[in-house]
Amino acid sequence: PIWIDDNPNTTVMEIRAKARRLKSRIGNLGLVVVDYLQLMSGRDRAENRQVEISEISRGLKILARELECPVMALSQLSRNLESRSDKRPMLSDLRESGAIEQDADVVMFLYRDEVYDPESSDTGMAEVQIAKHRSGPTDRVRLAFLPHFTKFVDMAKPGSDGPSAQ
């Protein structure tokens, strides 16, 4: 089952309490997803937003260990990449805190060249960049992007008729 809480101003403590209740009701959780880390609230007395985001990031890391399940946190990127010729995201582009990079076991970025260059020869393709992997290699994976389904699929193998729709 999927359980969604769309409270836009939640804290790590609220997520923790709700996840613990859910775990006690249904058993082990497969995955906790935080859509847009920067929308979360931290403690009121944090010195600045960077410290607040650092505390949120650390709290999510602790939550993953406590629940014994992965926590995926989606993060906004800074606008720094807009000023570079290569728009592929880098770890330093994670917005408002280096702690996100530090706390994460895995950091992945999505990149589509056609977003920045409508005439790109890579139209219909996306790159998943594994920029950090605490216990494995980093790499890039190219996928086909099907915008009418908002879906990513494996690229076609040579000699096939197109992207796999599995």
Task: Describe each model-derived feature in a short phrase.
Residues 3, 9-29, 58-68, 79-166:
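C-terminal regions of RecA-like/P-loop NTPase motor modules
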Residues 8-9, 49:
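Short beta->alpha junction loops/turns
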Residues 21, 29-74:
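Helical hairpin unit composed of two closely spaced alpha helices linked by a short loop
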